Amino acid sequence: MPVDFTGYWKMLANENFEEYLRALDVNVALRKIANLLKPDKEIVQEGDHMIIRTLSTFRNYIMDFQVGKEFEEDLTGIDDRKCMTTVSWDGDKLECVQKGEKEGRGWTQWIEGDELHLEMRVEGVVCKQVFKKVN
């Protein structure tokens, strides 16, 4: 059975985030603001149905999906694009592929101990985030 990501997670590290946003063509003002934020993640998982809430003082983003089923993801407020997204299990990791204007876009998420690791990719740029479980 896949790992359970359910919980509330506080950000510990956010490596190469501004470069990731630059690769998404996010304007410089938004990149500077976003780079100062330390968003939390609230994840609810019921089987293969997941809701991932990314919460910050500036903007919130909610991703609600069924693992293994492609859906249209509206990234308004991030880079204002839409893409066709599929999230799949790869062992105990979640692998996301986001098909759209940008090449090689997606992310991988996994748990090590009480830490949630998120590696986001676009056009060869990689951002690594680490969160600590608080409940």
Curated annotation (Swiss-Prot):
Membrane-spanning intervals of the chain: none
Record InterPro entries: Calycin, CRBP1, Fatty_acid-bd, ILBP, Lipocln_cytosolic_FA-bd_dom
Keywords (A to Z) from UniProt: Cytoplasm, Lipid droplet, Retinol-binding, Transport, Vitamin A
Domain of life: Eukaryota
Pfam families noted in UniProt: Lipocalin (PF00061)
Annotated compartments: Cytoplasm; Lipid droplet
Chain residues that bind all-trans-retinol: K41, M63, Q109
Region (Important for interaction with STRA6) residue spans: 22-32
One BP term from GO: retinol metabolic process
GO MF annotation terms: all-trans-retinol binding; fatty acid binding; retinal binding
A GO cellular component annotation in the UniProt record: cytosol
Homology family: Belongs to the calycin superfamily. Fatty-acid binding protein (FABP) family.
Job description of the protein: Cytoplasmic retinol-binding protein. Accepts retinol from the transport protein STRA6, and thereby contributes to retinol uptake, storage and retinoid homeostasis.
Oligomeric and partner information: Interacts (only as retinol-free apoprotein) with STRA6.
UniProt domain comment: Forms a beta-barrel structure that accommodates hydrophobic ligands in its interior.
Protein name: Retinol-binding protein 1
Source organism: Bos taurus (Bovine)
Higher taxonomy: Eukaryota, Metazoa, Chordata, Craniata, Vertebrata
